[in-house]
Amino acid sequence: MTTDVIADMLTRIRNANQRMLKTVNIPSSKMKLEIANILKEEGFISSFTVEGEVKKTITIELKYQGKQRVISGLKKISKPGLRVYAPANEIPQVLNGLGIAIVSTSQGIMTGKQARLSNIGGEVLAFVW
């Protein structure tokens, strides 16, 4: 069993994206659902659905433009051994605004841009570009 469920989610998406797969299945949790929702809102994935009764899984439908991947890269920033926290004014921009930072705040999980606008700092979970 993996100890870092967010890293596992990002790795599954990265591997499926590299193989140009249409969908990827991920064990479900509230945090993963929020991250999937952010990826959908920002246009990195087409859609996601939750399936199953007892053991719920998230099925993410990856997005491609012809033969080009929409997700160029995913990087886990805060790790179990080294947590990375940033105040609102120090949340990094990803590729000068072309990517997103996913931040866990006291108000929930949101993009770096939303956190800066709300003036809320938090734990920088990942970068997606």
Curated annotation (Swiss-Prot):
GO biological process: one example: translation
GO cellular component, one term: ribonucleoprotein complex
Annotated Gene3D superfamilies: 3.30.1370.30, 3.30.1490.10
Highest taxon of the lineage: Bacteria
Keywords in alphabetical order: Ribonucleoprotein, Ribosomal protein, RNA-binding, rRNA-binding
InterPro entries: Ribosomal_uS8 (IPR000630), Ribosomal_uS8_CS (IPR047863), Ribosomal_uS8_sf (IPR035987)
Gene Ontology molecular function, alphabetical: rRNA binding; structural constituent of ribosome
Keyword RNA-binding: yes
Function statement: One of the primary rRNA binding proteins, it binds directly to 16S rRNA central domain where it helps coordinate assembly of the platform of the 30S subunit.
Subunit structure: Part of the 30S ribosomal subunit. Contacts proteins S5 and S12.
Entries under HAMAP family matching the protein: Ribosomal_uS8_B
UniProt family annotation: Belongs to the universal ribosomal protein uS8 family.
Protein name per UniProt: Small ribosomal subunit protein uS8
Organism: Mesoplasma florum (strain ATCC 33453 / NBRC 100688 / NCTC 11704 / L1)
Top-level taxonomy: Bacteria, Bacillati, Mycoplasmatota, Mollicutes, Entomoplasmatales
Annotated gene: rpsH
